[in-house]
Amino acid sequence: MSSPVPLRVPFQGRELHADTLSGDSPLHLFGIHGGGASNRSVWDGLRQSLWQRGVGSTALDCVGHGQTGGVFAESSLQRRSHQVRSVMASAGVRPTALAGISMGAYNALRLSEELDVQALILIVPGIYTPEAHEVPFGPDFSAIIRRPRSWVDSDAWDILGRFRGRLLVIAGEQDSVIPLEIPERLHAAATRASRRELLVVPGAGHSGLLPVLLDNPQWHASLLECVGLEA
């Protein structure tokens, strides 16, 4: 990948580590990684593909991840969105496309409305009840999201019902974390989207989907087309 411009963004007494790549196109992707051991490097392959086609991108390591470090339990869904906004402001970018993996998909979904993006890519999307939004990660957060089907009353359905851009939802057929019902319902909810597609990757689990997608010409094309490119 071309050398990205590193960013060190002050945020609530710490520094967020991020980077941005410029492109000639007016299109710009912002990637939000998931929880666990994930970090912004998960987007490297897609960002390289976009950069080769003139599209810039930005990604960050949220608090508790990657170079940013810190304690995951000191963050929350709400604070992750605040971190994304801080990086966007520092980089001076207003993305046309948001992409999120797992937990990051919920951040992308909620931010899509206020940023009025043209495209939304949700990969193995984690969806949450609004009750969990401000709760710090830890036992209380876990107790909320572990309630059976707690995601049913998520605000995600209404947000996508208002979304008018391009939507790509990607699921792993063998995902043991995110039930297939969630990506199916997200796709179905986007009744006003200008374009919507659901990809279910055969045999895939919850992690490692992006390299698989990029290695498959048809799935790779779906990613590019959602961002706004002709494959």
Task: Annotate the PLM regions.
Residues 74-91:
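Alpha/beta-hydrolase active-site loop
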Residues 44, 165, 179-189:
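Short alpha-helix in the alpha/beta-hydrolase fold that links the catalytic acid
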Residues 163, 169-171, 175:
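Short beta-strand/loop motif that positions the catalytic acidic residue
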Residues 1-22:
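N-terminal cap/lid segment of alpha/beta-hydrolase-fold proteins
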Residues 110-150:
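Hydrolase active-site cap/lid region
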Residues 35-47, 181:
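The serine-hydrolase catalytic nucleophile loop
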Residues 50-69:
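Conserved alpha/beta-hydrolase
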Residues 204-215:
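Catalytic histidine-centered segment of alpha/beta-hydrolase-like enzymes
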